[in-house]
Amino acid sequence: VLSIMGCSSVFLVESNKKKCRFLSEVVRATNCSAVVHNGRIETYNDARDFDYIIARALAPLDRLLKLSFSLDRGQARCLFLKGRNYEQELIQAKKKWNMDVQIHKSLSFTLSSSAEKEFRGVVLEITNLRLKGG
């Protein structure tokens, strides 16, 4: 979506080959400039500068921070979609990490039985990521 909207450099890492084929087909069909890398983020080691690191349903926050930090040493702006337990994950992560965090309500909602919108999650916007004591 970011590449379709005009972002000039989008790099996607996906370990599932079937999803990679789908993403590659979308890139081809929409003539956008995204690059799809089939592999695990834990083993990705190509030197790049990232402006943003975005993840959804990948890992607990503490692990996401570790992965992000290994990619760019805390320089990128991280956008992580998290569910109901985000507060506990944030408390746990702050034991190891210093960071600036903004919490944005997710626009993803479901209708409850009372037909009212039910909260489903947040987007954690994290900058200035640093390992405590490091």
Regions found by a protein language model. Name each.
Residues 6-7, 11-133:
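S-adenosylmethionine
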Residues 2:
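Aromatic pocket-lining residues of Rossmann-like dinucleotide-binding sites
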